[in-house]
Amino acid sequence: MKTISLALLGLLVMGALSGCSSRGKEPPTPPTPPAPPSPTEYIQSKRIVSYNDQLVPTSGVILAYNSQGQVIKQQDQYYDRDKKELVNSQYNIYTYQGAQLTKVESFYDGGTGSYRRVGATTYSYQGSQLLKKEDFEIDLNGNLDPKGYEEYTWVGGRKSIMKRYQIFQGRTTLSQSKKYLYQDGKEIEEDYAAGAKTPSMRNEYRYDDKGRTIELTHIQYLPEFDNEGKPTDRYNEVSRQVTYTEYNQRGDISRARYTFSAGGVSSGSTDTYAYSELDEKGNPQKLIVTRSTPGSADQILVQQTFAYTYAKL
């Protein structure tokens, strides 16, 4: 299973805040803390605040955990320029059965101060294998209204095929499919548009012995065009980015190296993750991510602070 470190968690959550997509419904992976001073304590909540280059807050998120380290609530926050503070916006509630995520419910207040449920996602399994993911909107009466679903096929204990369907005005159509391949120690994920013969995107993952991504190759394709200038169902590679990720002893990202090529031109950069101001439990309270690019001055990409609360089992 793919794991996400503390630093990457902060980046993903902040990205979800800036563009609320359906992918943001998956719960953020909890941080990987060092060995706690007491086996009876756990992280109960964590607040992540992002800042601009003037050190003014831009967004925030508060994550609540259960005693198993699973995220049970994600409260998003935005910066109110009039109040000059972070205020709550939408939030998600996560439900589990054992180690498996079974339901996500999304709530939004629309500036009214009164939250209402606006969406939900359910997950169905056979043993440890995810078989179906269903997305719902909420109608005017508060009932679940199906808007699409994903079906997964497994072969030999591995994911093989995913098909995504959308539902509109009672009609169900195939909108996208994915194929999963396993070659040269990599897990390969190919995305296909409906009816396409070749992929529109390809991700190749290599993991370490702890299940963490240490190499990711992302390949983007664009469709071929016929003699009349119309797109066909075949795609050609137009760009490739390879990311090499390193981790510190805590299990958080310490460095990410990128190489990018497109149109015969190549470039590269390196992101360095600096954690500081450890609290009494050994968890960092500050993160700065700096990007170094040959021929350019270093650039600060991310400035975040973390605040934790702890609870006893």
Where do the language-model regions lie?
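C-terminal motif of bacterial Sec signal peptides marking the signal peptidase cleavage site
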Residues: 16-19
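Buried hydrophobic residues that stabilize the cores of well-folded domains
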Residues: 24-313
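Sec-dependent N-terminal signal peptides
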Residues: 6-14
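Positively charged n-region of N-terminal signal peptides that target proteins for export
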Residues: 1-5
